[in-house]
Amino acid sequence: MAKKVDKVVKLQIPAGKANPAPPVGPALGQAGVNIMGFCKEFNARTQDQAGLIIPVEISVYEDRSFTFITKTPPAPVLLKKAAGIEKGSGEPNKAKVATVTKDQVREIANSKMQDLNAADEEAAMRIIEGTARSMGIVVE
């Protein structure tokens, strides 16, 4: 018989840098999870993606055991990395802060494909282009 899920905790944590300090500690402490066990497992699983923020969905079961799924980094994080900027524009419709190429957008769309609600690569690219536009990044 499958274990019954008690709680689902969603967090965004820098890859390889999970520690018991906030926000990880309090969120998992309330759910009754072994915080150090999670931190070690998460850091081991994400050490090759250093510098990126990784969304994680932790399923906590009634017996306080847990499993977690790491997702692909958020599109804005990948776009900022591709454009080489710290943050997007404060006024995206007026002030453009950077440019990215269609190839960079295609690469991001392919890496995000499993998490996007898109039927094909073209639709995924349009989603990423829309995100770029709302950040003040021009797509060439």
Swiss-Prot record:
<dbReference type="InterPro" id="IPR006519">
    <property type="entry name" value="Ribosomal_uL11_bac-typ"/>
</dbReference>
<comment type="function">
    <text>Forms part of the ribosomal stalk which helps the ribosome interact with GTP-bound translation factors.</text>
</comment>
<keyword id="KW-0687">Ribonucleoprotein</keyword>
<dbReference type="InterPro" id="IPR000911">
    <property type="entry name" value="Ribosomal_uL11"/>
</dbReference>
<dbReference type="GO" id="GO:0006412">
    <property type="term" value="P:translation"/>
</dbReference>
<dbReference type="GO" id="GO:0003735">
    <property type="term" value="F:structural constituent of ribosome"/>
</dbReference>
<dbReference type="GO" id="GO:0070180">
    <property type="term" value="F:large ribosomal subunit rRNA binding"/>
</dbReference>
<dbReference type="InterPro" id="IPR020785">
    <property type="entry name" value="Ribosomal_uL11_CS"/>
</dbReference>
<comment type="similarity">
    <text>Belongs to the universal ribosomal protein uL11 family.</text>
</comment>
<dbReference type="InterPro" id="IPR036769">
    <property type="entry name" value="Ribosomal_uL11_C_sf"/>
</dbReference>
<dbReference type="InterPro" id="IPR020784">
    <property type="entry name" value="Ribosomal_uL11_N"/>
</dbReference>
<keyword id="KW-0488">Methylation</keyword>
<keyword id="KW-0699">rRNA-binding</keyword>
<dbReference type="InterPro" id="IPR020783">
    <property type="entry name" value="Ribosomal_uL11_C"/>
</dbReference>
<dbReference type="Pfam" id="PF00298">
    <property type="entry name" value="Ribosomal_L11"/>
</dbReference>
<dbReference type="GO" id="GO:0022625">
    <property type="term" value="C:cytosolic large ribosomal subunit"/>
</dbReference>
<protein>
    <recommendedName>
        <fullName>Large ribosomal subunit protein uL11</fullName>
    </recommendedName>
</protein>
<comment type="subunit">
    <text>Part of the ribosomal stalk of the 50S ribosomal subunit. Interacts with L10 and the large rRNA to form the base of the stalk. L10 forms an elongated spine to which L12 dimers bind in a sequential fashion forming a multimeric L10(L12)X complex.</text>
</comment>
<keyword id="KW-0689">Ribosomal protein</keyword>
<dbReference type="InterPro" id="IPR036796">
    <property type="entry name" value="Ribosomal_uL11_N_sf"/>
</dbReference>
<keyword id="KW-0694">RNA-binding</keyword>
<dbReference type="Pfam" id="PF03946">
    <property type="entry name" value="Ribosomal_L11_N"/>
</dbReference>
